[in-house]
């Protein structure tokens, strides 16, 4: 993924996040609670038909937790304050993300034992996925008030408009010009 302004590669550490004009319309503030559980161990997930990115991130809580980690959130209480999720579901999702090596735990308090949750390299590599989904949402799920989150590329100072490009020719990828191989 590259910045369309300066054409440099962009990592999650190269970007700052700011609330945009559409932030007040974030549907996560609606306190809807549903009970659901995802298998939290590889063995349990191995019993499912598919074990892939969609199974890991297709759950709204897991995807939101990872997105918040890119914003600098790293404690259970901080995730819980931001998301209207039941504590047992949040604990389950954090356990899943640690088991899948998306997060690693670092103790910050001994009694009672509490952890900071940090993105691993594997987790940080999900950044282009989230930026691409944000761009899609900004285009197709607009409320008319503007984007809820604005990204700035720290290196060049421009608003980030990321492009996924071919690693061979450097051109932006167009869905009709990409073929998937099995």
Predicted regions and their residues:
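C-terminal regulatory/oligomerization modules of transcriptional regulators
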Residues: 1-34, 142-182
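Beta-hairpin "wing" of winged helix-turn-helix
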Residues: 100-113
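N-terminal helix-turn-helix DNA-binding core of bacterial DNA-binding proteins
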Residues: 48-89
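Amphipathic, soluble alpha-helical interaction motifs
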Residues: 100, 136-139
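Globin-like tetrapyrrole-binding proteins
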Residues: 133
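Short, Lys/Arg-enriched N-terminal segment that forms or immediately precedes the first helix
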Residues: 30-54
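Short, hydrophobic-biased segments on the C-terminal half of alpha helices
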Residues: 94-95
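Basic, amphipathic "hinge/linker" alpha-helix immediately C-terminal to the N-terminal HTH DNA-binding motif
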Residues: 111-130
């Amino acid at each position: 993924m590259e910045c369309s302004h300066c054409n440099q590669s962009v990592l999650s550490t190269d970007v700052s996040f700011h609330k945009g004009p559409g932030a007040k319309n974030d549907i996560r503030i609606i306190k809807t609670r549903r009970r659901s559980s995802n298998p939290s161990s590889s063995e349990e997930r191995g019993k499912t038909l598919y074990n892939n990115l969609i199974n890991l991130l297709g759950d709204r809580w897991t995807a939101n937790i990872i997105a918040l980690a890119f914003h600098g959130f790293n404690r259970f209480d901080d995730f819980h304050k931001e998301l209207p999720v039941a504590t047992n579901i949040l604990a389950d999702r954090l356990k899943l993300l640690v088991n899948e090596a998306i997060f690693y735990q670092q103790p910050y308090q001994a009694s009672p034992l509490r952890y900071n949750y940090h993105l691993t390299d594997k987790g940080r590599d999900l950044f282009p996925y989230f930026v691409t989904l944000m761009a899609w949402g900004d285009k197709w799920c607009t409320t008319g008030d503007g984007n809820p989150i604005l990204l700035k590329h720290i290196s060049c100072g421009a608003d980030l408009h990321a492009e996924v490009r071919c690693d061979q020719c450097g051109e932006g990828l167009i869905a009709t010009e990409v073929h998937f191989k099995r």
